[in-house]
Design a protein with these regions (language model features):
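A short, N-terminal "cap"/entry segment at the start of jelly-roll beta-barrel domains
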Residues: 2-54, 95, 102-103
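Extracytoplasmic low-complexity repetitive segments enriched in small/polar residues
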Residues: 43-44, 58-62, 86, 99-101, ...
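Extracellular/periplasmic catalytic domains that process cell-envelope and extracellular macromolecules
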Residues: 48, 71-72, 79, 115-119
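Short coil/loop residues immediately preceding or within conserved phosphate-binding loops
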Residues: 55, 75, 107
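Short acidic-glycine-tyrosine-enriched beta hairpin
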Residues: 60, 90-107
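Histidine-centered metal-chelating micro-motifs
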Residues: 65-67, 86, 101-113
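Glycine- and acidic-residue-biased ligand/ion/polar-headgroup-sensing regions
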Residues: 71-90
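Ligand-binding loop in jelly-roll beta-barrel domains
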Residues: 107-131
Length: 131
C-alpha cells in the first residue's frame, strides 16, 4: 500500500471525530453532497504539497446516478452509511450496502447509481488538488 493511500486511510479515521463544516458542491439531479471536513495535507505530510484530504457526505436519491469519471490523481475511500449503491467499472457492476466500503485509485474509471427505493448515503474521503 503506497504512502498516499495509507495516509488517506489513517487521516479518514482521525477526521471522523472532527466537527462538521458545511459546503454544498454542484451535483447531478438526485444527488446531494455535503462537505464534512478537509485538511491541507502539506501541513501534515511533506510529500503531498498542494493537496487536501476531503471528507464529504453524499446522498443518492432513488434512481440517481453520477457520470463516468476517473480517479487519476485523486484516490478515494467510500463508506456506505445507509442504503445501497451500485459501483460500475467497465462491464462489472458491484452493489455495496450499509457498513461496506470500497476504494477508487489512480486506474479507476467508474460511475455509481442507486437503483433502490431508499436514499443511499455515502461518506466519501478523497485526496484532491488544493483549489
Amino acid at each position: 500500500m503506497n504512502a498516499l493511500r495509507m495516509s488517506a486511510i489513517l487521516c479518514t479515521g482521525a477526521l471522523a471525530a472532527v466537527a462538521i463544516a458545511t459546503a454544498t458542491a454542484q451535483t447531478p439531479r438526485g444527488q446531494s453532497t455535503k462537505q464534512l471536513v478537509s485538511v491541507d495535507l502539506a501541513s501534515e505530510i511533506d510529500s503531498v504539497q498542494g493537496r487536501i484530504l476531503r471528507m464529504q457526505m453524499t446522498t443518492y436519491d432513488p434512481g440517481a446516478s453520477n457520470t463516468a469519471h476517473s480517479h487519476k490523481d485523486r484516490p478515494e475511500v467510500v463508506y456506505v452509511l445507509s442504503g445501497k449503491i451500485i459501483d460500475h467499472r467497465g462491464d462489472v457492476a458491484k452493489e455495496y450496502g450499509a457498513g461496506e466500503s470500497f476504494t477508487a485509485g489512480k486506474d479507476t474509471m467508474h460511475w455509481m447509481e442507486n437503483q433502490g427505493g431508499l436514499p443511499a448515503v455515502l461518506i466519501v474521503s478523497t485526496i484532491v488538488k488544493k483549489e
